[in-house]
From Swiss-Prot:
Protein name: Large ribosomal subunit protein uL18
Listed Pfam families: Ribosomal_L18p (PF00861)
GO molecular function, one term: 5S rRNA binding
CDD domains linked: Ribosomal_L18_L5e (cd00432)
Quaternary state and interactors: Part of the 50S ribosomal subunit; part of the 5S rRNA/L5/L18/L25 subcomplex. Contacts the 5S and 23S rRNAs.
rRNA-binding keyword on record: yes
Organism: Tropheryma whipplei (strain Twist)
Amino acid sequence: MSLTSRASARKRRHVRLRKKISGTCDRPRLSVTRSNRHVFVQAVDDISGKTLVSASTMEKDIRALELGKTERALAVGKLVAQRALAVGVKSAVFDRGGCKYTGRVAAVAEGAREAGLQT
């Protein structure tokens, strides 16, 4: 499969997914964006259009860890869950961003669940 068709397939999956889910203030959307090197996670309230908390592998605490990409994604999931719990969010809707639920995307969800966030 060529790179352009893979990217367009991911975009189609994401559009299809976003039709079905949206976040609220009580239960925000946990949006995962993945690049070749980094993972970015945001807890988004779609009603007001605001990001409540965010975390990524580009933060100093996570960058300092001598881990692989999947283990760092797990740490990002734990970090975003801790920050969400600190602002009073107990559960979230998981938005995989059109990516398949495996590897780093699944690790973010597992990390968030381990830290106490219900997804």
